[in-house]
Curated annotation (Swiss-Prot):
This is UPF0301 protein Neut_0448. It comes from Nitrosomonas eutropha (strain DSM 101675 / C91 / Nm57). Belongs to the UPF0301 (AlgH) family. Transmembrane segments: none annotated. Gene3D superfamilies: VC0467-like (3.40.1740.10). Pfam families: DUF179. It comes from the Bacteria. GO terms for cellular component: cytosol.
Length: 186
């Protein structure tokens, strides 16, 4: 069996995940290899704005637009830790590159740069991440828990969090409300 690599892809939760954390989620896969996968849910916001988060961290945000940018709930793992998905990649401490332009950073230096208007051009800030052990994501895919599609920067950074899942579904030519809870194999 050939290994798949879903780095820089979206995972679209199938309706059968209705009762789980991942119900109706769109997850961006930042890294996927033989050791497992790491991603961020990109369509579930918290009640916290990026401006409030930075202020709570003792920073003085300079950009008023940060008050309208919600902090996302990136996943059920390490929900007390912040993660910044951004373009361009840049030279931050603790950055994982998903592709040549998109990075995931988990260090305070990028948040300070955002507060000082010196950060990356495009950002999503999340608390927590989504993680899969080796082979776990592949098993969930075989059980029809997810649809996959190559990610698009436009969906991540230009659409509101509410618009992201329908836009990713549209890439597959599918309306989310037409999906069935039933699975089958041809």
């Amino acid at each position: 069996m050939q290994a798949i690599n879903l780095t820089d892809h979206f995972l679209i939760a199938m309706p059968r995940l209705e009762d789980s954390f991942f119900a109706k989620t769109l997850t961006y896969i930042c890294e996927h290899n033989e050791q497992g996968a790491l991603g961020l849910v990109v369509n579930r916001s918290t009640d916290l704005s990026v401006e409030k988060l930075l202020t709570q961290l003792g920073m003085s945000p300079q950009d008023p637009a940060l008050s309208n940018l919600p902090v996302l709930l990136g996943g059920p793992v390490q929900v007390d830790n912040g993660f910044v998905l951004h373009e361009p990649v840049g030279a931050w401490r603790f950055t994982l590159s998903s592709n040549v332009v998109t990075g995931l950073t988990a260090s305070i230096d990028i948040l300070q740069a955002v507060a000082d208007c010196q950060g990356p051009e495009k950002i999503l800030v999340a608390l927590g991440y989504s993680g899969w052990a080796a082979g776990q994501l592949e098993q969930e895919l075989a059980q029809n828990a997810w649809l996959t599609v190559p990610a698009q920067s436009r969906i991540l950074f230009e659409l509101s969090f509410e618009e992201r899942l329908p836009a990713a579904m549209k890439l597959l030519g599918i309306d989310f409300f037409n999906l069935s809870n039933e699975v089958g194999h041809a």
